[in-house]
Swiss-Prot record:
The organism of origin for this protein: Pisum sativum (Garden pea)
GO BP annotation list: regulation of monoatomic anion transport
InterPro entries in alphabetical order: OEP21
Family stated for the protein in its record: Belongs to the plastid outer envelope porin OEP21 (TC 1.B.29) family.
GO cellular component: chloroplast outer membrane; etioplast membrane; pore complex
Protein name: Outer envelope pore protein 21, chloroplastic
Main location: plastid
Location in the cell: Plastid, Etioplast membrane; Plastid, Chloroplast outer membrane
Tissue and organ expression note: Present in roots, shoots and leaves.
Length: 177
């Protein structure tokens, strides 16, 4: 199980996040995620997805359900405590032969349980991985653009630490345990 501590500028509360992937077959797995808000002691998110990887296309597709009191980096729904159905897709294009620089397009759509409220997201990003940036230190830099919100974003990852920020001033920090 993967666990992390997360703190976002808009939440003012530390969250504990856990994720487990259970392999169904070679390229398919069942993924369960959950989050706990340490300020309220209540669940802040949860999801269950079936994800399939298409190795010939360097792409993934996921279908499942999710529950979020607050969706990704500060994007909120009108009513926050509904179950939502979700579809996710991602395609990676290597930019360099060594695979350290990639261009990725990704998208997703959530719909509430009554099929009345839709929320789409999608974007494109460049990712650059630098192994052994310094001794025992790997770094990843992502620069992208979220198309539906029309906002550029940045991610810097160093071993267990990840910092995310966007042009609207939203940010969060994650530490993987």
């Amino acid at each position: 199980m993967e666990t992390s501590l997360r703190y976002g500028g808009d939440s003012k509360a530390l969250k504990i996040h856990a994720k487990e992937k259970l392999r169904i077959d070679t390229n398919t797995f069942f993924q369960v995620r959950g989050g706990l808000d340490t300020k309220t002691g209540q669940p802040s998110s949860g999801s269950a997805l079936i994800r399939h990887f298409y190795p010939n296309f360097s792409a993934t597709l996921g279908v499942g359900v999710r529950y979020d009191k607050q969706d990704s980096v500060g994007v909120r729904y009108a009513k926050n405590d509904k179950l939502r159905y979700t579809v996710l897709a991602k395609k990676t294009f290597p930019v360099t032969n060594d695979g350290l620089v990639n261009f990725k397009i990704k998208g997703g759509c959530d719909v509430d349980q009554d099929f009345k409220e839709w929320k789409s997201r999608g974007g494109a990003e460049f990712s650059w991985n630098v192994f052994n940036f310094q001794k025992d230190q790997d770094v990843r830099l992502r620069i992208g653009y979220e198309a539906f919100e029309q906002v550029p974003y940045l991610q810097i990852r160093e071993n267990n630490w990840t910092f995310n920020a966007d042009y609207k001033g939203r940010w969060n920090v994650r530490y993987d345990l």
